[in-house]
Amino acid sequence: MVFGSKVIKAGNGEPDAFETQIGQAILELEMNSDLKPQLRDLYITRAREVEFNNKKAIIIYVPVPKQKAFQKVQTRLVRELEKKFSGKHVVFIAERRILPKPMRGRRDPNKQKRPRSRTLTAVYDAILEDLVFPAEVVGKRIRVKLDGSQLIKVHLDKNQQTTIEHKVDTFASVYKKLTGRDVTFEFPENYL
């Protein structure tokens, strides 16, 4: 089994050096740990490194059908990969596609209606959910400032505060890099 087999790119493209390195790390984890049965059928589509505030984070893209399987082992996988890549934060995001908005006046009878899961809003919301996993988004407030800019306040599950609080800056930076939207994360008290 070659290292690249853990990285299967769309259009049969060749993985770059960084993606091969990530694929090799996942393959080593599969060979050495008790995660072998869960990791056997899993692969990634691409990986990239983003820099923010003199820190680095690794974004690993996984195919949407394999996302549930990845999430079952994600906490252990993230812990092991962060050890391997000297403390860089690792996030898993499903590889989703945004279809363009249908234009008025242009008639294309063969074209299918655009599914909700391919809209910009749905994809951006799903990216947010993927980023903060295993925590859950329990609420969201969008504050529109007078100059028209938006600030999204995301309320996360208070029970997960201890596990992900140290990564909140990473989540905000990665989300800004991927979507261009400012976001802040909060852990509000549970109101009954």
Swiss-Prot record:
GO biological process: ribosomal small subunit biogenesis; rRNA processing; translation
Pfam assignment, any one: Ribosomal_S7e
Key word Signal present: no
Keyword entries, A-Z: Ribonucleoprotein, Ribosomal protein
GO CC list: cytosolic small ribosomal subunit; small-subunit processome
Keyword Ribonucleoprotein: yes
GO molecular function, one term: structural constituent of ribosome
Similarity field: Belongs to the eukaryotic ribosomal protein eS7 family.
Designated name of the protein: Small ribosomal subunit protein eS7
Encoding gene (name): RpS7
